[in-house]
Each structure stands twice: as structure tokens, then as C-alpha cells.
Amino acid sequence: MRVVILGSGVVGVTSAWYLCQAGHDVTVIDREPGPALETSAANAGQISPGYAAPWAAPGVPLKAIKWMFQRHAPLAVRLDGTQFQLKWMWQMLRNCDTRHYMENKGRMVRLAEYSRDCLKALRASTGIQYEGRQGGTLQLFRTAQQYENATRDIAVLEDAGVPYQLLESSRLAEVEPALAEVAHKLTGGLRLPNDETGDCQLFTQRLAQMAEQAGVTFRFNTPVEKLLYEGEQIYGVKCGDDIIKADAYVMAFGSYSTAMLKGIVDIPVYPLKGYSLTIPVAQDDGAPVSTILDETYKIAITRFDKRIRVGGMAEIVGFNTELLQPRRETLEMVVRDLFPRGGHVEQATFWTGLRPMTPDGTPVIGRTRFKNLWLNTGHGTLGWTMACGSGQLLSDILSGRTPAIPYDDLSVARYSPGFTPSRPRHLHGAHN
């Protein structure tokens, strides 16, 4: 089957890889000159299934009001003048209760755990290198309340069979030796030993090279104007004077998916702006070994080979990519507070990206009401964590195979009353 994938971020490229491996003729289209040059370029570097959790959580509405008056707040909201933003925020608020939180987190952890397994299998079969580490993730608590609240997340981890360690502050240095100097500032931590880290951009670029060698066609510097459709079928992608035709089309444009699908399929994917610093390592014994997640500031500090990536925060501000100095100061403050000898902060590279977020935090994956239009978007802050699993899942559904995990609750059907996703079926031209 001929498949066109719109988007060459980590989700688009992993989709291309798995579809190609399933025997399909795949073309990837992107406006950028190469893969992973937007949201996948400089994210926090975490592959953290156990910490897969929606921003829509109990207590967030009240916290959001408090954060409005804090200099280093993890979340900020500025109205962008669109009804879509207001509707999206209302839908998010409706997910901020315990029942929705547990349901959403459960399916996010399910997909993320599967995705990590897919990444391991891909690494074993291809030998792909991306400055990855398998040292786990350590979530740090600065208050007694945060430490106590961890029991709620532990219940979800236990249900999903995810191993964990709840550590008192005196034991944090056993996992991250450099924290010995600052343990007095912390109340404890939650460690997930099976989590991983890695450079998402490097991974995506190298996988794109492998995919191209395997037969995938990449059309870069190719802006997409619109999808062409008739009845319940997409019949082409208009790119300037060209119309690119295929048997199936996959939307993986991240935050730009919503606008591209306007009038075709309604999906609640909104840009969640985040920031990062990439810092050269100064003293190896003063830098993190793997990934740290600061629960107070919602900031991750991740170790690559000779670099430290500090990323986080969320701004609901529309398609604004301005680099704000106060956000840089927050990132610098957190990394200096936890790892004062770790990096040359003054040499850091400052970056921002737009994560494609749904109100419930879960991506939308699968077929739409158009029989040959598929979605793989809306992964929010977890695109790197969920990419391989999402790509394999999409490939299985599109190819008519039964996926390894349940997936009905990942469909756009949860936002489209009356639409029921079809079960896997053997499509004309699919290779199995």
C-alpha cells in the first residue's frame, strides 16, 4: 500500500519506519529541510513511561491560579483570542478530577510502557545510537505533601506492573551521587529504574537515515497546503503545484494537525509551549547520571554524553515561539540549585517548542471517519516516550493486524460522538 505521512518529527519518522517494515511504500512530507527540526529538536530527553501523566490533574485549577503570581511557575496561560483555546481549556478542566486523572494516566502508562519495549526491540535489531542511557528516572520532592501524594501515582504504577522505589532524602545520592550536596533541600524521591533517556533529535535523524535506506521517500522543504477529499476518501495532498496521491494518509503534524484537518476531522490538539537549555558538562561528578524530574517546577534534567538537557514548563499561549528570558532564568535556577557544579550554564543554548496536547493528555491514534485517513498526533510532552509504540501501533492497525495492546480508548472517537473506530481488518494492498 502507498502511504503518505505528514510530518517528520519523532512520531512521523517512527511511523514511517514501522510502516516500511510492514511492507508499505511510504513517503514522508515536511516543510522543514530535515527531520526533527521543530518540536522533536531539543526536548527534555526523557523516556519515562512511569511518569506518563496528564497535566489535567486534581488540584491543577487551584494551582494554576496560585502559579499566576509566581516567578518560576510551571504553567502559564495567556488568551490567544480564539474560541478553540477556550474550548480546549474547558475540556481540560473537565478532566481535572480523580476519576479522569486515573483513567487517563492508566492508558498513557500502558502506551508508554509498550513504546519503551518497542524502542528496546528497535535498538536490538538496528543498533541505533542516540546517546541513550538506561539509568532510570528520579522524581524529586521538595515538600512533605509531594512525598505523600506519590502514593496516588504508585497505585497506578502497581496496577501497570511498573517497578519503583520510594526513597527518603538520605538515599537519593545512592542513585544520583551529585545530589549528596543538596539532599537537605529535598524530602525524598520516586525512582523508576526501567526508564531511559536519549537525544530525541539524534534518534529521529538516524532512524530517518535507516528508513530512507530501507525505501522510505522523504520530501523535505515541501509545505502542505491542504488535504483533498471526496466523500469518505482522501484522494491527495496539495503541495504547491503538486498533488501527492496515496492509498492511505497519516497525520503526524503535531500541533499543526488541528489546522490542517479543519473542515475534515475535528481534533482537540493545541500547542503547549515548552522550553529547554542544552548545557555542556562542567564536572562529571557534579552532573546527573540519568534523568531528574523536579516535581515542584515540573522541570526535567537529563544527562547526555557531554551535555545536560534541562527542559519543562507549559504555556497555553497559542503558536507563540518567542524565547522569554524569565523562562530561561527558571531553567537556570533549577539546574544550578540541584547540580551547582554540573554544567557551564553560561554557555547554554536556549530553545522553545510547541508540544501537541489534547485536553486529557492522551494522543489520538487510529482511523478517522475518512476510511483512508489516520491520526498519530497529540502526544503532548511525551512524544519521545510514546513515539515507537505509537508508530508500531499505527502500523498494526493500518495493516490490518491485531495490535499488542488495547487501543480503542486512544481513538479520536472519544472526542467525536457517533464515530466508532473499526477493528483491524486486512486492507487492499496491505502486507502482513
UniProtKB/Swiss-Prot annotation:
<comment type="function">
    <text>Oxidative deamination of D-amino acids.</text>
</comment>
<comment type="pathway">
    <text>Amino-acid degradation; D-alanine degradation; NH(3) and pyruvate from D-alanine: step 1/1.</text>
</comment>
<keyword id="KW-0285">Flavoprotein</keyword>
<dbReference type="GO" id="GO:0008718">
    <property type="term" value="F:D-amino-acid dehydrogenase activity"/>
</dbReference>
<protein>
    <recommendedName>
        <fullName>D-amino acid dehydrogenase</fullName>
        <ecNumber>1.4.99.-</ecNumber>
    </recommendedName>
</protein>
<dbReference type="InterPro" id="IPR023080">
    <property type="entry name" value="DadA"/>
</dbReference>
<dbReference type="GO" id="GO:0055130">
    <property type="term" value="P:D-alanine catabolic process"/>
</dbReference>
<dbReference type="InterPro" id="IPR036188">
    <property type="entry name" value="FAD/NAD-bd_sf"/>
</dbReference>
<comment type="similarity">
    <text>Belongs to the DadA oxidoreductase family.</text>
</comment>
<dbReference type="InterPro" id="IPR006076">
    <property type="entry name" value="FAD-dep_OxRdtase"/>
</dbReference>
<feature type="binding site">
    <location>
        <begin position="3"/>
        <end position="17"/>
    </location>
    <ligand>
        <name>FAD</name>
    </ligand>
</feature>
<dbReference type="Pfam" id="PF01266">
    <property type="entry name" value="DAO"/>
</dbReference>
<keyword id="KW-0274">FAD</keyword>
<keyword id="KW-0560">Oxidoreductase</keyword>
<dbReference type="GO" id="GO:0005886">
    <property type="term" value="C:plasma membrane"/>
</dbReference>
<dbReference type="GO" id="GO:0005737">
    <property type="term" value="C:cytoplasm"/>
</dbReference>
